[in-house]
Amino acid sequence: MNQASYKNFLATIAPPASAEVLGKWGITTAQLLTSKVEELILPIFNEMDPNEISIYAVGGFGRKELAPFSDADLLFLTTERIEISNTIAALWDLGIKPSILVRKGGELITSVKRDLKFATTLIDARHLYGFELPLLLGPKEWIEKARPWFHREQEYERRIRLLKALGAGCQEPNIRDGRGGLRDLQLKHWLLKISEKHEMKSDSESRENNNILLGARTAIHLAVKRREDRMLLSDRRQLISWLGWENEDSFFQSVMLAMKRNAYGKKKKSDNRKHLVEEFKSRLRDVPLRPISGFLRLLDETGELELLLPEWRRIEGLVRTDSAHKYTPDEHTLRVIENLEALFQTQNNEINLSYLQRHDLLILAALFHDIGKGTGKNHEEEGTKSAVEFTKKFGFTKTEIERVSFLVRNHLLLSYNAFRRDIDDPHLIHDLAKKIGDVENLIMLYLLTVADLKAVSYTLWNDWKARLLDTLVSRLVRQCSSYLPPELFAKEAIIRRKATVEDLLSNSKSAEYISAHFDSVDGRYALAHTPEQIARHIQLIPELKKNAVVVERNQHPVSNCIELVVITHSHQGLFAEIAGTLSALDFNILSADISTRSDGVAIDTFRVSDSNNIDSSRWNSFVEDLKEVISGADNVENLLNKIMPYKKKSVGIKTEVSVEIDNESSGDYTIVEVMLPDEIGLLYRIASVFRNCEMSIATAIINTESEHGVDVFYVTDNSGKKIVKKNLLKRLKEKMLEIA
């Protein structure tokens, strides 16, 4: 049989019929693959002298747990040095990937003492060809003598392995190497084999979990046609298509639950719900003096949390398609509660946390905030229903129930508006404050938001997002206390900023410039910029008398990025020109703020990251290129064409493509949300579509952190009004989708 026929054999393997038979299918298929590989390789071994060599199947091959594209682990024991290169080449020609260890028979004991990996391979050694060594028969006396060493070395190896591989509770676990994966089960199997009672058998649940993971690993290999031991979201569609199951979630949830059971051991069975409820009530009353997260995690590990909260079983091991989430909803929820307890012990210089009085209600909201994800419906509303039912049964008052319900229903409110809406818009601040109601609601929602974001993944939360959220909440605290109309809120912001700027620029010559400047800007500009930034704008604007474009760069005081300020005369397509020039010099744009004075002076601020650092040469190139583009001496397309041949597009999860238009949230602007695959010059092409549709960008919120980032634009027509014509909005969507 040649390599092609082996691949044809793999193509004949039918998928399991359902999650219920995944384990049985997994072990049966692994044994079938093992037998097939043995059938292929034994004729090759028959050409060797059986008196000179002994060949053993080891590792997964030795256990008869072979996966389609995993290595066939072989141990060659020889009496003398012999030539095996032709044998190895013949194995590769079959389409089998051999992993071969070669030892002289007399070197075995020395190798075992020196090499833990080699020692463990011998535990499952299975004779295939040639002479047999008595040392590899029966219980492993040779390793029993070194049992303490074996335990110690295996634990060290496991700690190193788990640092590299995601496991139970993670959305994209490594089924082989992660916590609760096949390697953990193999370790348990090895320890049983070398225990004092080596005849003791592993429990049936461990065997079933092992078989489920074998089935999952085999299914992934066959579906994606390569060795892949991780359950990647990018492979999900291909895997679902190969399986052909009606219930798409059942495969992933079966795997996650098997890994969870492996990680925590056998679940306890308890029918004493009354005692459990009383203990939960007692611990909830003691928050924050006595943490409750450890108690809840223990209930989760023992399987008793679903006795307290039946909806919990729906989210256990549930894998969602959102690649931003590192953890499954059950693990994520427990981490949110742990994060809250940490926040209870911290101080925030920007936000006064003393408004928080009911820590217990916040813990309850965290427990229910994602519980609705198990229904497949709107998880905020479904979670709210569950929270209301639970708190009623537990005897909470109407006011307490309403507060918990508010938090669950609106747990995404602050993050959505902080990162996908213009927080410098006075109308937004007014509307949000009205919806939130009081400062205690706000502070509880703020803490829940921070804990939630930190529990999504360790990369999602950063200083920049913390600053945006703190800025929004600080403004909302003020608004919830005063309830100023948007116009007065904006006017107050201008007055406060102007007074501070006058202190910064305290000379008679500046007074005239300051008054003229604040007379020509709006409240949004005053909120968007610090007094120090505004003072610098006032100093730079007079330079327009000498130069058509004034450009300055500064290190941002909070986030690790560079702030570029471009001051020039406003014109159609200015945003596209700046964005395109930045892209052509390989700057990564994080955010952009576009402000235009009533006299037509544009003050545009771009925050960019640059892994290559901006040296004086690159900075001068940017300034010169921008001047030429704005003057018409050059164009962005020419600049981009110079670097495109040298830049590669990144390959990752298939990005959803969408363009959404919101004409309800803002009184003055049409909000356009764009989700397109990231590439060099994308922001320029998006801006060019707006320009070609005769629309002006007022604000841009750029998301560059994940494949599913949404860029948000506040736009108007050329007369500064919202875009309401349906045919123009339809054309905008069509043109945006054309650049995908």
Regions found by a protein language model. Name each.
Residues 4, 16, 145-271:
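Conserved nucleotidyltransferase catalytic core and NTase-mimicking acidic/glycine-rich helix/loop elements
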Residues 38-82:
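Active-site nucleotide-donor binding segment shared across nucleotidyl transfer reactions
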